């Protein structure tokens, strides 16, 4: 059984995973029930698992092709090993995502569900209503990256954190730490470091602006 999580931590995770699935205007989101958010979150994870396993299968096929040519070229063996290792890493990622699918319902049973729903919807509504302002803050804190080129999950983790800091009165440290934890669960190996760096710059920028007021 997973460890107990705070309602807001569960809400952030559900908001992140349901964001791409839940549509509609901000005022319509208030009618969304928790089971709809959960279904959207599970669909997102299922889609991620499917895509990851497809990539893994592709790497295995490429490795097999390289091995078939390996009788005359030793370099092909090395290349095949690299592809096989990549496929194994992708498979591990898919297994981790599958674990998250199983954990989410358990997390909900261990926490206060009305708080989870309310805060998840507050995040989603804020992201809809304040999208341009949130994007502007993130865009101004990126180094050698463009907002629209960010991986979707990384971009959404940043959006949630900035929305919390700007509009939901979440302390900087809490918003950053929670975003880093989400990145550790759902981003790639270096994702949490990237998220942490961007949000530190966001924090520095916003604090500097506040000091001038």
UniProtKB/Swiss-Prot annotation:
InterPro entries: NusB-like_sf, NusB_fam, NusB_RsmB_TIM44. GO terms for biological process: DNA-templated transcription termination; transcription antitermination. One of its GO terms (molecular function) is RNA binding. GO terms for cellular component: cytosol. Keywords: RNA-binding, Transcription, Transcription antitermination, Transcription regulation. Pfam families: NusB (PF01029). The keyword Amino-acid biosynthesis does not apply. Belongs to the NusB family. This is Transcription antitermination protein NusB. The lineage of its organism: Bacteria, Bacillati, Cyanobacteriota, Cyanophyceae, Oscillatoriophycideae.
């Amino acid at each position: 059984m997973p460890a107990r999580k705070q309602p807001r931590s569960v809400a952030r995770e559900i908001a992140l995973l349901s964001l791409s699935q839940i549509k509609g205007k901000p005022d319509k989101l208030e009618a969304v029930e928790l089971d709809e958010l959960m279904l959207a979150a599970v669909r997102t994870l299922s889609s991620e698992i499917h895509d990851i396993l497809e990539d893994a299968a592709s790497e295995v096929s490429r490795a097999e092709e390289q091995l078939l040519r390996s009788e005359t070229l030793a370099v092909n063996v090395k290349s095949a090993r690299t592809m096989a290792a990549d496929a194994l890493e992708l498979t591990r990622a898919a297994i981790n995502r599958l674990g998250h699918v199983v954990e989410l319902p358990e997390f909900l049973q261990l926490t206060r569900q009305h708080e989870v729903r309310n805060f998840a919807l507050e995040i989603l509504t804020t992201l809809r209503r304040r999208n341009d302002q949130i994007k502007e803050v993130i865009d101004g804190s990126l180094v050698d990256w463009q907002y629209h080129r960010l991986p979707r999950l990384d971009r959404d983790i940043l959006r949630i954190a900035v929305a919390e800091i700007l509009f939901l009165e979440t302390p900087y440290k809490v918003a950053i730490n929670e975003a880093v934890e989400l990145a550790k669960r759902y981003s790639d190996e270096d994702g949490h470091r990237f998220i942490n760096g961007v949000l530190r710059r966001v924090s520095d920028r916003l604090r500097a602006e506040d000091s001038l007021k």
